[in-house]
């Protein structure tokens, strides 16, 4: 479906934004900054925690995309091969997606004023800092 959407966009727009729907900390300011930067750049990529890709801004079909495990390096290498000079935009608010319970903890810590954090509070999700094998302990109250 993504390839079909990019084929549809080719010739109709200069660039596309490819982004998953599970980026709960993203805000208007974050997105505006990346879009403004993309006006002077051929290829912007935002990695996710764990080596994946959370956002790409590029010309439609500039590279073949493949999302999943360690896709970030694959996308950067593909952009390099096409001489697109990939620029990495490193942002906590755009790098966090929801894959683990620790990610829910990050939302509780950094997601002030987000709908996701409000919902997690309704579910009585609690987080505490720990310094063991995990950084955050996430529990659900009764």
Tell where the protein language model's regions lie, with residue ranges:
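Conserved alpha/beta core of the MobA/IspD/sugar-nucleotide pyrophosphorylase nucleotidyltransferase superfamily
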Residues: 77-142
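A short, conserved beta-to-alpha structural element at the edge of catalytic cores
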Residues: 44-60, 125-131
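Active-site acidic Asp-centered loop
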Residues: 19-21
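Conserved donor-nucleotide/metal-binding helix-loop-beta segment in metal-dependent transferases, i.e.
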Residues: 24-50
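Short phosphate-binding loop-to-helix
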Residues: 1-15
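Residue-level signal for alpha-helix termini/capping positions
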Residues: 7-10, 39, 80
